[in-house]
UniProtKB/Swiss-Prot annotation:
It catalyses: an N-acyl-L-alpha-aminoacyl-tRNA + H2O = an N-acyl-L-amino acid + a tRNA + H(+). It comes from Thermosynechococcus vestitus (strain NIES-2133 / IAM M-273 / BP-1). This is Peptidyl-tRNA hydrolase. InterPro entries: Pept_tRNA_hydro, Pept_tRNA_hydro_CS, Pept_tRNA_hydro_sf. Its main location: cytoplasm.
Length: 205
């Protein structure tokens, strides 16, 4: 049976100072999805985040942007899943990936934290690694040749996209939303086959 998500979570940090950072690309994907379906995400204290309900491919889907800050994202997701009695396995988590080049997506059915603190928090609070993720690449230029690690990752992910990177960012966000739509319609596995090999051409550094 196809794994079709009914909850889409975009990871990021709240606050205007973080809004345009690379680390917030998960938030921006969710905003793009909400705009496509003309719905408004609203803050709900019960869920420690901004939420909306939308019909996608005829299915009711809940959107969530945790406003707990990245490192506590799991608190928000756990609250929503517990309230609606929904399984973690049907949650698709959208987040940035500093090991993937900007313009690339990678869907995974499950896995470890991959060094991402938002994913780490979800695993800790929901007590499982068994949930699909949509990783959105943010690496660009010299970053593609660097080793990712705690020492150099933080300044990069909390930095802002350059004008060159911003030139393709809208297309990247649209591609990510397309992948979400197909995941909901046909299952994450089908979307993996279609989108894991696709990329938006990178601009020249």
């Amino acid at each position: 049976m196809a794994l079709q998500p009914c909850v889409i979570v975009g990871l990021g940090n709240p606050g205007i100072e973080y809004a345009t950072t690379r680390h917030n690309v998960g938030f921006r994907v969710l905003d793009t999805l909400a705009q496509r379906y003309r719905v408004q995400l609203t803050q709900q204290r019960r869920f420690l985040g901004e939420v909306a309900e939308v019909l996608i491919q005829g299915q009711k889907v809940r959107l969530l942007k945790p406003t707990t800050y990245m490192n506590s994202s799991g608190q928000s997701l756990h609250a929503l899943l517990n309230f609606y009695k929904l399984p973690l396995e049907r949650t698709l988590v959208v987040h940035d990936d500093a090991d993937l080049p900007l313009g690339r997506l990678r869907l995974r059915l499950s896995g470890s934290t991959g060094g991402h603190n938002g994913i780490k928090s979800i695993i800790q609070h929901c007590h499982s690694q068994q949930f699909p993720r949509l990783k959105v690449g943010i690496a660009f230029g010299d970053r593609l040749q660097q080793q990712t690690g705690p020492r150099n990752a933080v300044p990069f992910v909390l930095g802002h996209f350059s004008a060159t990177e911003l030139a393709i960012l809208p297309a990247v966000l649209d591609l990510a939303v397309d992948a979400i739509e197909l995941s909901i319609q046909s299952g994450v596995e089908v979307a993996m086959n279609r989108y894991n090999g696709k990329s938006i051409p990178l601009p020249q550094a």
